[in-house]
């Protein structure tokens, strides 16, 4: 996770958790000429519109005071959804047995994109099974990952 995203997470996770939600993660991207800050929240009983509204209101207040994002930005708050992004090793551990898709920061074994069954998480490595071949991928190389829902 980039430095600015790490600072935002440290600033905003306690706000989300104080409202009874789990801070799942965040994405900070450029969208045209302004930034887009996406915050993903989770709740055991499921995330409702009211949860998103409450988190958005409180996070907006903190961002207005702290002003960590230069220029204009859009704030979005939502549940991670069925195709949820995976940000931490704990997230990967929760979804062992599921199909995941991920992109690496740099090539590993000649490729950057992988999609397969998440079979294990050991130490700081994620293990994927793709076409009967096992890939052991260092977590620090993962740029983006998400669960691929089954229909």
From Swiss-Prot:
Required for maturation of 30S ribosomal subunits. It holds the Pfam family DUF150_C. GO terms for biological process: ribosomal small subunit assembly; translation. HAMAP family: RimP (MF_01077). The keyword Amino-acid biosynthesis does not apply. This is Ribosome maturation factor RimP. Gene3D superfamilies: Ribosome maturation factor RimP, C-terminal domain (2.30.30.180), RimP-like superfamily, N-terminal (3.30.300.70).
